[in-house]
Curated annotation (Swiss-Prot):
It comes from Cupriavidus metallidurans (strain ATCC 43123 / DSM 2839 / NBRC 102507 / CH34) (Ralstonia metallidurans). HAMAP family: Ribosomal_bS21. NCBIfam families: S21p (TIGR00030). GO terms for cellular component: ribonucleoprotein complex; ribosome. This is Small ribosomal subunit protein bS21B. Belongs to the bacterial ribosomal protein bS21 family. Keywords: Ribonucleoprotein, Ribosomal protein. It comes from the Bacteria. The keyword Disulfide bond does not apply. Coiled coil: none annotated.
Length: 70
């Protein structure tokens, strides 16, 4: 569980921003969203496979040489 301690005379908005930052670093929010609803094992495998294909395609696109513009 993520906790933060309030410092003396710290505004609530600043404490809330610190809390959000720690949640982001821990990766808690995406995990909660993923666990919100049950996902079939086949759907999970398909989603992960599609994400891997997309990552691979993106990596290949960044390695390709640009076309000559002349």
């Amino acid at each position: 569980m993520t906790t933060i301690r309030l410092k003396e005379n710290e505004p609530f908005e600043v404490a809330l921003r610190r809390f959000k930052r720690t949640i982001e670093k821990n990766g808690l929010l995406p995990e909660l969203r993923a666990r919100e609803f049950y996902e079939k094992p086949t759907a999970e495998r398909k989603r992960k496979r599609d994400a891997a294909v997309k990552r691979n395609y993106k990596r290949l696109r960044s390695q390709m040489l640009p076309k000559k513009l002349y």
